[in-house]
């Protein structure tokens, strides 16, 4: 819907605020008020999430869930856009000398990405691991039954993991109604104290993923960190290079302590 203004211009009905601001200007404290309103938004969202009940709470959580998924997708798309491609957009028509040929093509990102994929494709079993045998963990010890159901609480299909876990940055929770395995935030670890056996140094490195949990394939899928688990860590800080001169980014390590007792993850690098 549009309306005709005095000058003969068409204007949408929802643009009257912009028209008023063009004619009369803004309040002197307009920018400050906008800044404060935006700063209060997160507090308002938190208050609604904690205090809404019933159908309103359900609809609000669905809305927030969809917003978070879209935000994660936007962030991921932005990060992928920032990575340089290995091939140039158009081949240059002007001839270049030999020593300048490699400057026009950004191959580092592609090489690192390929190296990481190759590393992940390898089997962890090919390494001589420091802990060849570990004690088994029963499902009763690993999972705590969470009773659900309106009023009666008779349903017992949900499980809470009682051991430390690793959850990737791209993980998006399912709606609460369909979430079978709950991984508490207090038991999630992102870094490990990794010891290099040859260099004799211990460094705190970010965990990239769980390669294999010796207890159960399900525990591997859930990212459970127990003694003897093979994890992949980011070793770019150590400055390791391959024989061809490429930077080593991801490397496997085995957890040597009991994280749920110690409150930290200690591991030995597999070299």
Swiss-Prot record:
Which cellular component, as a GO term, is one annotated location?
Answer: nucleolus
Q: Which Gene3D superfamilies match?
A: 2.40.10.310
Return the annotated region ranges for Disordered: 22-97
Motif Nuclear localization signal 1 located where? 25-32
Q: Nuclear localization signal 2: where is this motif?
A: 62-69
Q: Name one Pfam family in it.
A: Ribosomal_S8e
Keyword Protein biosynthesis assigned to the entry: answer is no
Chain intervals with Basic residues compositional bias: 61-75
Keyword Ribonucleoprotein included in the entry's annotation:
yes
Instruction: List, as start-end ranges, the regions of compositional bias called Basic and acidic residues.
Output: 22-46
**Keywords for this protein:** Nucleus, Ribonucleoprotein, Ribosome biogenesis, rRNA processing
Question: Could you tell me what this protein does?
Answer: Involved in the biogenesis of the 60S ribosomal subunit. May play a part in the quality control of pre-60S particles.
Subunit structure, as described in the record: Component of the pre-66S ribosomal particle. Interacts with nop7 and rrp1. Interacts with rsa4 (via WD repeats).
Q: Which family does it belong to?
A: Belongs to the eukaryotic ribosomal protein eS8 family. Ribosome biogenesis protein NSA2 subfamily.
Q: What is this protein called?
A: Ribosome biogenesis protein nsa2
Originating organism: Neosartorya fischeri (strain ATCC 1020 / DSM 3700 / CBS 544.65 / FGSC A1164 / JCM 1740 / NRRL 181 / WB 181) (Aspergillus fischerianus)
> Which taxonomic lineage is given here?
Eukaryota, Fungi, Dikarya, Ascomycota, Pezizomycotina
Q: Which gene encodes it?
A: nsa2
């Amino acid at each position: 819907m549009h309306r005709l203004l005095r000058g003969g211009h068409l204007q949408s009905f929802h643009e009257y605020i912009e028209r008023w601001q063009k004619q009369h200007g803004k309040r002197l404290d307009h920018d400050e008020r906008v800044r404060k309103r935006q700063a209060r938004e997160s507090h308002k969202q938190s208050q609604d999430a904690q205090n809404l009940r019933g159908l309103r709470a359900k609809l609000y959580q669905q809305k927030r869930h969809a917003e978070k998924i879209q935000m994660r997708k936007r962030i991921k798309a932005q990060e992928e856009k920032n990575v340089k491609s290995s091939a140039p957009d158009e081949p240059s028509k002007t001839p270049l000398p030999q020593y300048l040929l490699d400057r026009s093509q950004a191959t580092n990102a592609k090489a690192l990405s390929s190296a990481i994929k190759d590393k992940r494709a390898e089997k962890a079993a090919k390494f001589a691991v420091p802990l060849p045998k570990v004690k088994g963990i029963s499902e009763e010890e690993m999972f705590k039954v969470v009773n659900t159901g309106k009023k009666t609480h008779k349903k017992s299909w949900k499980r809470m993991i009682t051991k430390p876990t690793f959850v990737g940055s791209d993980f998006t929770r399912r709606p609460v109604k369909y979430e079978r395995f709950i991984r508490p935030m207090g038991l999630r670890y992102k870094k490990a104290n990794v010891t290099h056996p040859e260099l004799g140094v211990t460094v705190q490195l970010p965990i990239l993923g769980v390669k294999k949990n010796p207890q159960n394939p399900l525990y591997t899928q859930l990212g459970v960190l127990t003694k003897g688990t093979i994890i992949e860590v980011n070793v770019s800080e150590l400055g390791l290079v391959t024989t061809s001169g490429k930077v080593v980014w991801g490397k496997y390590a085995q957890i040597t302590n009991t994280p749920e007792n110690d409150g930290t993850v200690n591991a030995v690098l597999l070299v």
